From Swiss-Prot:
(7,8-dihydropterin-6-yl)methyl diphosphate binds at T59, D93, N112, D176, K212, R248, V249, H250. It is an enzyme of class 2 (transferase). Catalyzes the condensation of para-aminobenzoate (pABA) with 6-hydroxymethyl-7,8-dihydropterin diphosphate (DHPt-PP) to form 7,8-dihydropteroate (H2Pte), the immediate precursor of folate derivatives. GO terms for biological process: folic acid biosynthetic process; tetrahydrofolate biosynthetic process. This is Dihydropteroate synthase. Pathway: Cofactor biosynthesis; tetrahydrofolate biosynthesis; 7,8-dihydrofolate from 2-amino-4-hydroxy-6-hydroxymethyl-7,8-dihydropteridine diphosphate and 4-aminobenzoate: step 1/2. Homodimer or homotrimer. The lineage of its organism: Bacteria, Bacillati, Bacillota, Bacilli, Lactobacillales. Its EC number is 2.5.1.15. Keywords: Folate biosynthesis, Magnesium, Metal-binding, Transferase. One of its GO terms (molecular function) is metal ion binding.
Length: 266
């Protein structure tokens, strides 16, 4: 499997989540020192992660805005330390070009933008400048849709075209339907049922639903975030069967066997 100029063995891969934030919904405050972050990265790599997604600002509903300066202070030391110690691809989870540039200079390989270039109009130019793969996620301000799957597909197609127009090569563009972002439980569920339509847009698809509220709802409600890893793994299997190629998860080990087996059947 290729992500731009990068090659990953197999037809599917796990992206391990590393939140260096104090307020992420699942593991906020757990990895706020470089050493704690490195220890977690080492475990995720041992468990089978092929990409580490580093985030310095929580994007959960109601989260506090973080300036680019503070975000850079959080992520750059961690990215540098990971690159110094491990041979692993790193994505930077940010929608700010200033942070993204600093992360790329520090050694990050991939951009992961939860606003698909809408928040910062220079993100696509930056991706083109660095020949960096970019993940474009569906997002919007309100949970209002004519038909959620079609609207998500239209959005992703339009944003991918905007990236192409800005000089990003097609093989550097990945898409993410944005589960948990501006979508009700019902809308998330509807999108899950029609995930194959997203996978037919002509771009590789990242699946990110790990521990989110819709997983809790599918389990009947009242579960804690870390109690959702088994269901997350089941949904990873479902997504890979629908055509997704990367699953973004908190618990790498719980997903590794599924990805290893299904990767050989894709």
């Amino acid at each position: 499997m290729k992500i731009g100029k990068f090659v990953i063995e197999g037809n599917a891969a796990i992206m391990g989540i590393l939140n260096v934030t104090p307020d992420s919904f699942s593991d906020g405050g757990s990895y706020t020192t470089v050493q704690k972050a490195l220890d977690h990265v080492e475990q995720m790599i041992a468990d089978g992660a092929k990409i580490i997604d580093v985030g310095g600002e929580s994007t959960r509903p109601g989260c506090q805005f973080v300036s680019a300066t503070d975000e850079i202070d959080r992520v750059v030391p961690v990215i540098k330390a990971i690159k110094e110690n491990y041979d692993i691809l790193i994505s930077i989870d940010t929608y700010k070009t200033e942070t993204a540039r600093a992360a790329l200079e520090a050694g990050a390989d991939i951009l992961n933008d939860v606003w698909a270039g809408l928040y910062d109009g220079q993100m696509f130019a930056l991706a083109a400048e660095y020949d960096a793969p970019i993940i474009l996620m569906h997002n919007q301000d309100e949970e209002v849709y004519q038909e959620v799957t079609q609207d998500v597909c239209d959005f992703l197609g339009n944003r991918a075209q905007a990236a192409l127009d800005a000089g990003v090569p097609k093989n550097n563009i990945w898409i993410d339907p944005g589960f948990g972002f501006a979508k009700s439980v019902q809308q998330n569920t509807e999108l899950l049922k029609r995930l194959d339509r997203v996978c037919q847009l002509g771009y590789p698809v990242l699946f990110g639903i790990s521990r989110k509220r819709v997983v809790d709802a599918l389990l009947g409600g009242n579960t804690k975030a870390k109690e959702r890893d088994g269901a997350t793994a089941a949904l990873s299997a479902y997504a890979l069967g629908k055509g997704c190629q990367i699953v973004r998860v908190h618990d790498v080990k719980a997903n590794q066997d599924i990805v290893a087996v299904l990767s050989q059947l894709m």
